């Protein structure tokens, strides 16, 4: 792993990487609520430098290194990659960290694991606004925080009701509630905390 970590550290420390981080942060994402015909699209446009940084992180396994190297100091390597890349640009690290940390939840549900893990384990950055099933790589975000509870997850009020009398892991649920905050809304799927 030392060679990979050294390579990523070298890339993260380049002047070019810091320049891209500067441009990505100077040019905030912009919501494009409608297309030119007035149809609702709710797309988020990012500066090209942001996409370059996302590609750099994903192509170097900053989001999934631990899962490609389980039992071989993979999580330690994941921590090192996270630390090094955070020095260059912290905003990119949010979708990286969420995608990394969602894996145990995905693995608890075989059908969902089979559907999502191959694309989550991909090292391809695919920013296209298309269905996740058509993408070469995905990112997974999280909806946890609610106004009344902040980071106290015990006080959440969002609840899940099974659809079509199917209950349990892997079933479909109707979610009702209000999440106050979402990092990285351009992710392809979301883990949502509900009762």
Residue ranges and their predicted role:
Residues 40-131, 183-184:
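Internal helix-loop-helix
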Residues 112-163, 168-171:
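Internal maturation/activation junctions in enzymes
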Residues 105-106, 144, 194:
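Hydrophobic residues within well-ordered, non-membrane alpha-helices that form the packing/core
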Residues 75-84, 163-169, 174:
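Short, hydrophobic/aliphatic alpha-helical segments
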Residues 1-71:
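Extended, charge-enriched "interface" segments that sit outside catalytic cores
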Residues 170-195:
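A short core secondary-structure module
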């Amino acid at each position: 792993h030392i060679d990979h970590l050294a390579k990523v550290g070298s890339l993260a420390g380049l002047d070019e990487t810091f320049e891209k981080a500067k441009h990505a942060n100077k040019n905030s994402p912009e919501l494009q609520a409608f297309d030119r015909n007035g149809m609702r699209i709710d797309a988020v446009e990012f500066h090209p430098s942001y996409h370059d940084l996302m590609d750099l992180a994903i192509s170097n396994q900053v989001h999934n290194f631990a899962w490609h190297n389980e039992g071989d100091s993979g999580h330690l390597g994941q921590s090192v990659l996270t630390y090094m890349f955070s020095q260059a640009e912290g905003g990119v690290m949010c979708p990286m960290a969420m995608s990394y940390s969602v894996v145990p939840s995905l693995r608890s549900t075989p059908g969902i694991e089979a559907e999502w893990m191959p694309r989550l384990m991909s090292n391809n950055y695919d920013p296209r606004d298309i269905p996740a099933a058509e993408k070469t790589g995905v990112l997974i975000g999280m909806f946890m925080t609610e106004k009344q509870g902040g980071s106290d997850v015990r006080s959440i009020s969002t609840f899940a009701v099974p659809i079509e009398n199917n209950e349990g892991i892997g079933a479909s649920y109707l979610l009702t509630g209000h999440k106050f905050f979402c990092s990285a809304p351009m992710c392809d799927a979301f883990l949502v905390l509900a009762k």
